Curated annotation (Swiss-Prot):
One of its GO terms (molecular function) is double-stranded DNA binding. It is found in: Cytoplasm, Nucleoid. NCBIfam families: PRK00321.1-4, PRK00321.1-5. Pfam families: RdgC. This is Recombination-associated protein RdgC.
Length: 299
């Protein structure tokens, strides 16, 4: 249930539609399986099997954007197109021109699409309207951009902006390592990436490796800056902070898992309990992380 990544956003103005209102808006852009000739289809799906498009617990909302894509390798299309082109050349006595090759490739694609396999990818969105957070569970910026585009399309107007802080993650993370002191409530873990600002982009990575403060300071003195840092918040949640203010590798620690054990009687109750706990913990983490980065900067 827990999100593994957080692409963090803020509401720039109060946003408090009811779950029913959000449901009605998403329903206009709901997911439907694509036809045999569609390369990709996208729409909102239920976070739970056959449930509503907006899963709510209290004021917390959970959404799911589903993407279905046909797997049709370019190499296969090109191979069949070349074979067809050779047949045409033999028939007409000369090679097909550029326009004819383009039309032939489109024809081959249409013929192969119905036989192509489909894969589905779900990307989840957590909305905390009371505290003004919206987070997308996506590691890559491109996937987050897709979700944002669909959110703006379905929930217009949506006063959504990226989280802005007063101190850049790179400057803050480098400062913490140079001073061998994590911000209050956080500890530094054994995964670090230091990168040079020079054209070479020389990079040093520590993965599950004991950290030597003097060694880190030497790298920083040589001009390297921290672009990736593993941390733990209040002994409850571990994560990796990136230079782009993306929170990755989010994982609840044992103390949270122990609290969750035995509190639910069935799968639905367990899902809601996990979602409630995740929302509460991540909201607290984001507040403290924002403060550690100098506080929120209003755009």
């Amino acid at each position: 249930m827990w999100f593994k990544n957080l692409q963090v956003h803020r509401f720039s103005a109060p946003w408090s539609p009811s779950a029913d209102e959000v449901e009605a808006s998403l329903a206009k852009h709901a997911f439907f399986p694509g036809t045999s000739l569609e390369m990709q289809t996208q729409g909102w799906a239920s976070p739970r099997d056959n449930g509503p498009l907006v899963h709510t617990v209290g004021r917390q909302m959970l959404l799911t954007l589903r993407t279905e894509k046909k797997l049709l390798p370019t190499t296969v299309v090109n191979q069949v197109t070349r074979a067809r082109a050779a047949e045409i050349e033999e028939q007409q006595g000369y090679k097909p021109g550029r326009k004819q090759m383009k039309e032939l490739k489109e024809q081959v694609t249409e013929e192969l699409l119905p036989r192509a396999f489909s894969i589905r990818r779900d990307t989840r969105v957590w909305i905390d309207p009371d505290n003004g957070w919206l987070a997308i569970d996506a590691a890559a910026a491109a996937k987050a951009d897709e979700v944002r585009g669909m959110l703006f399309k379905a929930l217009d107007p949506l006063p959504l902006i990226n989280l802005h802080v007063n101190q850049s993650p790179v400057a803050a993370m480098t400062e913490w390592l140079a001073g061998d002191a994590a911000p209050a409530g956080f500890t530094v873990d054994q995964e670090i990436e230091l990168q040079s600002g020079a054209e070479s982009k020389a990079t040093v990575r520590y993965v599950r490796h004991p950290l030597d403060p003097e060694d880190l300071r030497r790298h920083i003195a040589a001009g390297k800056r921290c672009t990736r840092l593993a941390m733990t918040w209040n002994d409850r949640v571990s994560f990796v902070l990136t230079d782009g203010l993306v929170v990755k590798k989010v994982a609840p620690l044992d103390v949270i898992k122990e609290q969750a054990d035995g509190t639910a009687h069935d799968e639905d109750e367990r899902f809601d309990a996990d979602f409630t706990m995740m929302a509460g913990e991540l909201s607290g983490l984001l507040v403290d992380l924002t403060e550690a980065l100098g506080g929120e900067r209003k755009a």
